[in-house]
Amino acid sequence: MASQGTKRSYEQMETDGERQNATEIRASVGKMIDGIGRFYIQMCTELKLSDYEGRLIQNSLTIERMVLSAFDERRNRYLEEHPSAGKDPKKTGGPIYKRVDGKWMRELVLYDKEEIRRIWRQANNGDDATRGLTHMMIWHSNLNDTTYQRTRALVRTGMDPRMCSLMQGSTLPRRSGAAGAAVKGVGTMVMELIRMIKRGINDRNFWRGENGRKTRIAYERMCNILKGKFQTAAQRAMMDQVRESRNPGNAEYEDLIFLARSALILRGSVAHKSCLPACVYGPAVASGYDFEKEGYSLVGIDPFKLLQNSQVYSLIRPNENPAHKSQLVWMACNSAAFEDLRLLSFIRGTKVFPRGKLSTRGVQIASNENMDTMESSTLELRSRYWAIRTRSGGNTNQQRASAGQISVQPAFSVQKNLPFDKSTIMAAFTGNTEGRTSDMRAEIIRMMEGAKPEEVSFRGRGVFELSDEKATNPIVPSFDMSNEGSYFFGDNAEEYDN
């Protein structure tokens, strides 16, 4: 497995990486959550939101987006240098929903970015608190991962749309730092690299001059991030080759596509963090809970406990099923878009359906949607059990998967066989040995052929009762192997468009 010793834990990435013990890490993650909560409370006061309106997930998303936009230095600079009609580069805002005379009304608010930054810093003891901002970015990314299937983006870069289990974090902004890089899937990194290579092929000056030098450094850094996700020597050696290329072109492109495919069986290590909407942290802080004092972890029982005691509401369109809307948000809160549905159903305690079977659109409401017919309902975000999140990719084995998705990327460390459609995946490799790295390719293909669908990953790991905070009694679930394992099955999911 990956050399765990040299890698920093997510919490260290989350906390600027000084080696800390568990208690310090928990306190420092708790401090970040406190800051988000305090900011949210203050914004609800500014916007004069009632308790119910403050717990509306759509309002939470608008407030989160406002602060992310206020701190987006590069975009702010760009907007000031390229003024566009009707856009004030110094202001940020969005739709806020209020209940007026028994109806939901949309109100567009506009704030000075400077004012939002002031409120954010004040909530974070005068700090910029970039980690809190990244945390919100990852929550938005997890929500996108559960809502949209990135078929078009995959096809545009020449990847198979069925490889969606590799696309975690594909909508994360570039500025999301180490914590953001940790949650990006192999496919996401491959896609970012391919975009660079394609630009280099089309634009002779892309790698040249002072700008080209910066581009080159970014390219090598992305290669190293991707290399660090792979867990076999052959995959890593291929990444070295891609990184060291003098002039990245078609050969590197082919190698990256090959590596992405190989990751369906020889899975990369991708972090999973439970990032919740600000409207969960706000009320908890308001009720007097001190996250810094109590400590908090994004990968253990804490998010489960928090969701167990939270009330979150959502606007519901006329033909949407509130239970399905709840499942969408539940999966996002648990960063589980690419986990096996059999396990998710077990943890949640109610059946979790593939995306195409859900009668619900995304959580955000477009500005042209009619508010007259909008209802609201409680999101059911509680779980029956809790489980420890994993970063390992759970490699040993595999099993049958579905037409819409041919592999999984586990989110929880629980004993199971990981479904994947070996014949479909291997078919992509037959006769494709041209290229310069045939020995590494042969080695990777050999390992993939050796992977057995029946083998079990995370042996002996189980889920836990919510009362079992110290994780002493693992319950190992047994699964019906005949059941569908993947979420983007068949594919009725909408596309994610920026």
Curated annotation (Swiss-Prot):
Keywords: Capsid protein, Helical capsid protein, Host nucleus, Host-virus interaction, Ribonucleoprotein, RNA-binding, Viral nucleoprotein, Viral penetration into host nucleus, Virion, Virus entry into host cell
Native source species: Influenza A virus (strain A/Memphis/4/1973 H3N2)
Name of the coding gene: NP
Lineage per the UniProt record: Viruses, Riboviria, Orthornavirae, Negarnaviricota, Polyploviricotina
Protein family per UniProt: Belongs to the influenza viruses nucleoprotein family.
Extent of motif Unconventional nuclear localization signal: 1-18
Primary site of residence: virion
Name of this chain's protein: Nucleoprotein
Role according to the record: Encapsidates the negative strand viral RNA, protecting it from nucleases. The encapsidated genomic RNA is termed the ribonucleoprotein (RNP) and serves as template for transcription and replication. The RNP needs to be localized in the host nucleus to start an infectious cycle, but is too large to diffuse through the nuclear pore complex. NP comprises at least 2 nuclear localization signals that are responsible for the active RNP import into the nucleus through cellular importin alpha/beta pathway.
Compartment(s): Virion; Host nucleus
